[in-house]
Regions:
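ATP-binding glycine-rich loop module of kinase domains
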Residues: 9-33
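Conserved HxN/HPN-centered segment at the entrance to the catalytic loop
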Residues: 47-55
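Short beta-strand micro-motifs within the conserved protein kinase catalytic domain, predominantly
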Residues: 54-63
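Conserved short submotifs of the Hanks-type protein kinase catalytic core
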Residues: 62-73
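Conserved kinase catalytic-core helix
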Residues: 76-111
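An alpha-helical support segment within catalytic cores of ATP-dependent transferases
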Residues: 102-149, 153, 157-162, 166
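Active-site activation/catalytic loop segments of kinase-like enzymes and analogous catalytic loops
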Residues: 185-215, 230-241
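Conserved small/polar residues in nucleotide/adenosyl-binding loops
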Residues: 244-250
Length: 252
């Protein structure tokens, strides 16, 4: 029996017989569906323990992707249920991110190339700002670490005990996965946490502090990526425009 987990105009997700199937609307671009499946399989090939891709199919003109189903709440749901454990949850979130960033797949899209195209396509930014952003982007170090691209509590599935202690953790929705600089992915998640929890929440700061502490990374280095990922994210979320100012005045 199908159990629907989510429904929208463009896609729906249901669980049946231990498998999760994402069904896309007939109007959904076929190449986007196939790209999502390809990216997921490339993350698997990199050795990351994620729900495995099982099938790509088309039924009645609707494309679908079927994967293993991992039962459990999202990290967002766990934070809402056990707010007093948020610090531990954020640390677990960072530890898992660090673990998959140690992996890589040379077939994944290069993050800096993707961001270059995104920034160039943004109509909200004038050419002088674009030039400054692209100059900084080109100066950033080239890495090949696995970056999720949309790593946030809504895309993290956990297994927890009766007291809310996390036993296992995994991530889903790897369609935006790339190879690139780990700090860029951290800056992107920091922005997503800001958009999700708001400026008054201390969760974003605790997240970025945990990463810097666990990896011995300077906060200033992660900060250099903030206006870049904020600008790139404008192609998906117009709310991100309020964060492009984070370090823009210091761009030289």
């Amino acid at each position: 029996m199908k159990k629907y987990l989510a429904k929208s105009k463009l896609k729906s997700v249901y669980v049946e017989n231990g498998k999760a199937t994402k069904v896309f609307a007939k109007t959904y671009n076929k190449s986007d569906v196939l790209y999502e499946a390809l990216n997921t399989s490339r993350v698997e090939d990199a050795g990351v323990n994620i729900p495995k891709l099982l099938e790509v199919a088309v039924t009645d003109g609707k494309w679908s992707i079927t994967s293993e189903y991992v039962e459990g709440p999202t990290l967002t749901q766990l934070i809402e249920k056990y707010p007093d454990k948020a610090d531990d949850y954020i640390k677990k979130m960072v530890e898992y991110q660090i673990s998959f960033q140690k992996k890589s797949n040379p077939l994944l899209l290069v993050l800096k190339d993707k961001m270059n195209r995104q920034i160039n396509s943004i109509e909200e930014l004038d050419n002088s700002v674009k030039y400054e952003l692209l100059t900084r982007l080109n100066s950033m170090k080239n890495h090949t670490k696995l970056c999720h691209g949309d790593y946030c509590p809504d895309n993290i599935i956990v297994t927890a005990d009766a007291k809310g202690n996390i036993k296992e953790i995994t991530a889903v929705d790897w369609v935006h996965a790339t190879q690139g600089n780990a700090s860029a992915d951290i800056a992107n998640t920091f922005l997503l946490l800001k958009l999700q929890f708001g400026d008054k929440s201390d969760i974003p700061e605790k997240y970025i502090s945990a990463f810097c502490e666990l990896t011995n990374t300077k906060r200033s280095y992660v900060n250099e990526w903030l206006p870049l990922v904020a600008a790139a994210r404008l192609t998906k979320n117009k709310e991100a425009v309020s964060y492009t100012h984070l370090t823009l005045p210091t761009i030289a």
